[in-house]
Amino acid sequence: FNAVEGNTTFYARPAPATVARWAQVMPEHFRFTAKFPRDISHEGDLRDQLEPAFDFTRLMAPLGRRVAPYWLQLQASFGPARLAELDQFLQQIGVPVAVEVRHPAFFAKGEEERALNRLLHACGVERVCLDPRALFSCTSRDPAVLHAQAKKPKVPPRPAAFSQHPQVRFIGHPQLEANEPFLTPWVEKVGAWIEEGRSPYIFLHTSDNRLSAALAQRFHQRLMQRLPGLAALPELPRAPEVEQLGLL
């Protein structure tokens, strides 16, 4: 795989030595979508968080272009009345950013959602598309499933391509075959984006992420059928989770 969601930075800033180690082991082509820490995205006016945000981007600077884009995940209480804050933050931050929103008004197909999309499009900023439908179709009482359903917002997918790099988070069903009908529209959408010359970022999860790699391989195999000539994924190492834990 050639990209990973940087969820760890949402909860805690890495030490400079950790960032230096990441810079040593990450290939130049690898992409790390580092999330702004939650004290930046979830506490107070975004305009007041610009200096901490600059500090964070300076911390991550040793990774260079491998951090692209940064993700700004906004809480569900961040609504249309605060778009002016978001606009100023995006105008001044100075690094590639993608934004994930969770307020219901931004999924209502009304003027408030259109205003958000206009703002992001004007800034060349992607709207992160979360698709949790497969997860919420699951009726299992497994604790991992229930935990994931409690954490993820039940929002409709909003595919967007405001730049060369559309961003998709697909939260899957724990039974791989149950994801097929939910993956089908994404195979077509992602295939069309690639044909347009875009390079989408597609992140696939399962409730406990043990099958995430298998789900990603399944999706890529279908994408290869949609796009003849698309290169196959390299074979996974036997214990990828151990390597990733060492990285993070």
PLM region spans:
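Residues lining hydrophobic/aromatic ligand-binding pockets adjacent to catalytic sites
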Residues: 1-248
